[in-house]
Amino acid sequence: MSLVHINILMAFIMSLTGLLMYRSHLMSALLCLEGMMLSLFVLATLTILNSHFTLANMMPIILLVFAACEAAIGLALLVMISNTYGTDYVQNLNLLQC
């Protein structure tokens, strides 16, 4: 395993740790999720380039599409919570149930 792969895995682990530690605010949780998705994208791209597996060239692009959709939904939820309650605490998500 090369040093680049180890650094990317460490970035993923740091983002996961940040998600587990700072989960009280929705904005920090969304930032940690974006860090995880970015490290997964770079790791998938490097793995496909190193293995020369041409059939999976679209996988990083599909991962980016899902990351963009996740970010859009997360930001819409953040705006809705902050407009309704004035804060971005994750505990307010339980109050949005119908």
From Swiss-Prot:
<keyword id="KW-0249">Electron transport</keyword>
<dbReference type="GO" id="GO:0008137">
    <property type="term" value="F:NADH dehydrogenase (ubiquinone) activity"/>
</dbReference>
<dbReference type="GO" id="GO:0042773">
    <property type="term" value="P:ATP synthesis coupled electron transport"/>
</dbReference>
<dbReference type="InterPro" id="IPR039428">
    <property type="entry name" value="NUOK/Mnh_C1-like"/>
</dbReference>
<dbReference type="GO" id="GO:0045271">
    <property type="term" value="C:respiratory chain complex I"/>
</dbReference>
<feature type="transmembrane region" description="Helical">
    <location>
        <begin position="61"/>
        <end position="81"/>
    </location>
</feature>
<keyword id="KW-0813">Transport</keyword>
<keyword id="KW-0812">Transmembrane</keyword>
<keyword id="KW-0520">NAD</keyword>
<keyword id="KW-1133">Transmembrane helix</keyword>
<keyword id="KW-0830">Ubiquinone</keyword>
<keyword id="KW-0679">Respiratory chain</keyword>
<dbReference type="GO" id="GO:0005743">
    <property type="term" value="C:mitochondrial inner membrane"/>
</dbReference>
<keyword id="KW-0496">Mitochondrion</keyword>
<keyword id="KW-1278">Translocase</keyword>
<comment type="subunit">
    <text>Core subunit of respiratory chain NADH dehydrogenase (Complex I) which is composed of 45 different subunits.</text>
</comment>
<keyword id="KW-0999">Mitochondrion inner membrane</keyword>
<dbReference type="Pfam" id="PF00420">
    <property type="entry name" value="Oxidored_q2"/>
</dbReference>
<dbReference type="InterPro" id="IPR001133">
    <property type="entry name" value="NADH_UbQ_OxRdtase_chain4L/K"/>
</dbReference>
<protein>
    <recommendedName>
        <fullName>NADH-ubiquinone oxidoreductase chain 4L</fullName>
        <ecNumber>7.1.1.2</ecNumber>
    </recommendedName>
</protein>
<comment type="similarity">
    <text>Belongs to the complex I subunit 4L family.</text>
</comment>
<comment type="function">
    <text>Core subunit of the mitochondrial membrane respiratory chain NADH dehydrogenase (Complex I) which catalyzes electron transfer from NADH through the respiratory chain, using ubiquinone as an electron acceptor. Part of the enzyme membrane arm which is embedded in the lipid bilayer and involved in proton translocation.</text>
</comment>
<feature type="transmembrane region" description="Helical">
    <location>
        <begin position="1"/>
        <end position="21"/>
    </location>
</feature>
<keyword id="KW-0472">Membrane</keyword>
<feature type="transmembrane region" description="Helical">
    <location>
        <begin position="29"/>
        <end position="49"/>
    </location>
</feature>
